Structures are given as C-alpha cells and as structure tokens.
Amino acid sequence: MASLADRVRGNGRIAAGLLFNLLVSICIVFLNKWIYVHHGFPNMSLTLVHFVVTWLGLYICQKLNIFAPKSLPLSKLLLLALSFCGFVVFTNLSLQNNTIGTYQLAKAMTTPVIIAIQTFWYQKRFSVRIQLTLIPITVGVILNSYYDVKFHSLGMVFAALGVVVTSLYQVWVGAKQHELQVNSMQLLYYQAPMSSAMLLVAVPFFEPVFAEGGIFGPWSVSALLMVLLSGIIAFMVNLSIYWIIGNTSPVTYNMFGHFKFCITLCGGYILFKDPLSVNQGLGILCTLFGILTYTHFKLSEQEGSKSKLVQRP
C-alpha cells in the first residue's frame, strides 16, 4: 500500500513538473513578444537581463544544495559562452521580427542543421529513415515562410542565424558536458556570468544605454516589471527542463516538447491575431509530421542500441 502511495506521489510530482514547464515555456515566448510589441525594450538588453537573473538563480540554487558547482577552466568555455549569447540574441530577434508561428516553426530547422554539423564535422552517421524525416520538416518550414502574409526578410535572416548558432551551441554543449564531465546546470553556472560579461561589453555598440529606448533609459514601472518577470521566467524554464530530464524518460521529454510546440503555435495565432492561410497550415502539419517521425525513429534506435548492449556477454 505504501509503495502505491509513493508511486502516486511520484507521478503527481512529475505531472506538476510537466505542467509547470508547460506554463513557463509558453509564457516566456508570449511575454517576450508582448515586451517587444508593446514596450519596444531592446533585444540585447533583455537577453542580458535574462543571463544575469539566470546566474543569480543558479547561485541561489547551489547555496540551497540543489546542485554542486564544479571548478571548470574558463578558457575552455569562451566559445560556448559566445555561442550562448548568439543563440539567445538571434532567437529573440527572430521572435521580435517574425510572427510567433514562423518563429516557432523556424526553430524546427535546428534538427536538420545539427544532423548536418554532426555528419560533416564529427563524422557521425545517421540512418536513411532519420535523414528522410528532414524532408517534411524543411518543406513545412519553407511552405509556412513563403505563405506568411507578415513575411519579414530581416526576420528570416535572424531566424536563419538563430538556427545555425543554436545548432552549434547544442552540439558544443553536448561535447563540453562529455569532455568536462558536468551536467547542464554546472555548465550554465559558468556560462551565464561569462555571457553576461560579453553582452555588457557589446550592448553599448548596438543599443542606446542611457538614452530613450536604452536599458537605463526612462521606462514605465510596468515595462520594468515585465522585463524582470521575463528574466525570472527564463530561469524557471531552464530549471524545469533540467528537472524534467532528470526525472522522466526521453520519450516523455520529447513528446511533451511536441505538445508545447503545438500549444505555442495556436496561442500565437489567437493572442496576436496572426493570419493563418491554408498553405501555412499545411506547412505546420508537414513540419509536425517530420518532427514526430524523427522522434519516433530516433528513440526506437536508441532503445535498440541499449538492448544490444544488455544482450552482449
């Protein structure tokens, strides 16, 4: 009876964690878009706020023994911290200059680009069926972008840069975690302050600092509260992702990611009144089909590899 109660409590915690991640992941997209549309807060400055709040949050977490920091050589993290800056800045610029649907769908191109990077630079091999799933993903993104009535050429440039830098960042994070034998929170504990310092130097060259429209310019209390809330929610997204990965299976994590993908798309069209044509709808369905089949094949191949290792004498 006790074990049943423990299982129920455990499942309840997982359900609560998934629900929390769903809320904050969707909230951060809509809140950032709201800040850009209604307050015009500068992009790099908002990213800087996110990094600083994330580092402060991680500092509090390590003081509460949620994770143990590990001493790491800063020289080995410079490129990773720089790519972290680029990944968040370009992703936010894509959100600022595109509809939420186009922004969200463009992010799906990260998978094909990661596969290309790992194939050409790391000589990693992928099965034919995995490679074939990249076709509907790519076709769907192109369809959606081509028929987007709010198509913004600069926005697509930012989206493309965001995809490339995000893909590099994700590949390098995996490599660094393996090389340095650290988890994502231990790595982020060093990345966040390093990336903050880099942006602190870069911001004055690209954005006004004390003038109107700058981070220290005259802002309303509501705008500043929204920016601070955005930073706190960004930290909560990182923390909840770490918790989900540690407490659920890869299948749960991936399937839940697809659910968030669909909810964010629908929310963007409802909240921001973004027009949706039939061809865009087909593009979204095409991309979603590609993502789902990719996940199915990838997870089945991973399970097959594990079973072979178990059977090996």
Swiss-Prot record:
Keywords: Membrane, Transmembrane, Transmembrane helix. It is a multi-pass membrane protein. It holds the Pfam family TPT. The chain crosses the membrane at residues 17-37, 40-60, 71-91, 126-146, 154-174, 187-206, 225-245, 252-272, 275-295. It is found in: Membrane. The keyword Transmembrane helix applies. One of its GO terms (cellular component) is membrane. It comes from the Eukaryota. The keyword Transmembrane applies. InterPro entries: Sugar_P_trans_dom (IPR004853), TPT_transporter (IPR050186). Putative transporter. Belongs to the TPT transporter family. SLC35E subfamily. This is Solute carrier family 35 member E3. It comes from Mus musculus. The lineage of its organism: Eukaryota, Metazoa, Chordata, Craniata, Vertebrata.
